[in-house]
């Protein structure tokens, strides 16, 4: 375990100071975790072998201290209806979101216009949606060799964390998504027994502009995913052209497919490199699947 102390963060400055922001020492964040790696190599015959390696890591954190003048915590990121907030006793990356207001029976409320009612953005009204960071990361590499052929692949996985589909929210809010179109064709949308006009529902709960107070709870997904990260298939041409040189040719494929994911986008997406915006899809380019050829000549 380790403690990270005196991290610098930008917070709003008092109005009378004439400044927009000031920097503070945020306090003390305690990290606890472990990592281990285990490997195995087996030569089954003179021509066939297998090697494997598994890497596993776990990390959790807790905010032990914050500066005294932040009674509502430190907001790292505020986008529309979601905030990443640091609170004493909480965790780095805790996500709080606006949500549909409901009655005592769990049914969504609507105003006199027939629009769903979305909560405010004060700490008392926001709903805790989970933590943005995955607690468990895993990678598993395997290599098989038979005579001059080789096959290797890497499977990696992340367990836990949250991602936000802001692209999805915007398309809903603008009324151009598949689901909003289907709702219009169906004459409305029913949510937990309450029927809404499709346009009124999605314009309110979706993100019709990037600062609108939409119901982010509808667009938060589990970031858990397991993917085939890389596959390499190669062959070694020995004593090439009788010159005593070997040429290894390998076909490489990366980001081939997911074995499992809950989010409609790649959970590794990020809206930028700043604090609190990892795991946010904001019209990001789709993750590419790539193929390549590698040639290696040994003298």
Give the predicted meaning of each segment.
Residues 4, 46, 148-153, 240-241:
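Repeated loop/turn-to-beta-strand initiation elements of outer-membrane beta-barrel proteins
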Residues 7-12, 58-77, 161-187, 259-269:
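Outer-membrane beta-barrel and related beta-rich outer-membrane complex signature
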Residues 10-21, 115-124, 204-217, 271-277:
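Flexible, solvent-exposed coil segments and beta strand-coil junctions
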Residues 23-31, 77-107, 186-194, 198-200, ...:
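C-terminal beta-signal and terminal closure region of outer-membrane beta-barrel proteins
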Residues 24-30, 34, 41-132, 172, ...:
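Conserved small-residue
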Residues 34-42, 50-58, 138-144, 149-157, ...:
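Membrane-embedded beta-strands that build the outer-membrane beta-barrel scaffold
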Residues 158-248, 252-254:
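Extracytoplasmic gating/loop element in the C-terminal half of outer-membrane beta-barrel translocons
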